[in-house]
């Protein structure tokens, strides 16, 4: 349990820069998600007794999501590689609803925007729960941390 481990949190998050940059909107989402994640998170690699704080590098390679975890001083802690297959549908649906949302905020009624946003939040929650389940036994995260990590997974997809 993260409460028993000192400094079970992230102090730095980096996305694989080799994928390249995306649109200003996506880059803004990335920056906000990283800021929010660093400000408040619960993150503990299972089996690590020394505790954090931790640095995380997220990258994509051959349809796999790679979590490279080090201590604040750079010492390696763990690398976890997850298949993206369980997340593909929800990420695809999330992209589609985000596109609808961005179009709606330009011309739709407030009630239509609110309805689309509720659907977007629901899909975001679903993706967060799926990611949290995929990390179980590897990295302990709370739901809010999983939500912010899911946002970053989506940013990697947008860029990749």
Curated annotation (Swiss-Prot):
Annotated Pfam families: UPF0262
InterPro entries documented for this protein: UCP032146 (IPR008321)
NCBIfam families tied to this protein: PRK02853.1
Family in the record: Belongs to the UPF0262 family.
Protein name from the UniProt record: UPF0262 protein BCAN_A0255
């Amino acid at each position: 349990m993260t409460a028993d481990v000192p400094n079970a949190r992230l102090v730095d998050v980096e996305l694989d820069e080799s994928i390249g940059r995306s649109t200003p909107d996506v880059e803004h989402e990335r920056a906000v998600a990283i800021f929010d994640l660093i400000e408040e998170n619960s993150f503990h690699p299972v089996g690590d007794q020394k505790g954090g704080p931790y640095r995380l590098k997220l990258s994509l390679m051959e349809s796999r999501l790679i979590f490279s975890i080090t201590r604040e001083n750079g010492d390696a802690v763990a690398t976890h590689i997850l298949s993206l297959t369980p997340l593909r549908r929800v990420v695809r649906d999330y992209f589609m609803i985000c596109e609808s949302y961005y179009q709606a905020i330009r011309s739709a009624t407030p009630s239509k925007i609110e309805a689309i946003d509720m659907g977007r939040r629901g899909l975001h929650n679903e993706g967060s729960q799926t990611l949290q389940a995929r990390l179980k036994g590897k990295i302990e995260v709370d739901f809010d941390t999983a939500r912010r990590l899911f946002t970053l997974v989506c940013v990697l997809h947008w860029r990749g």
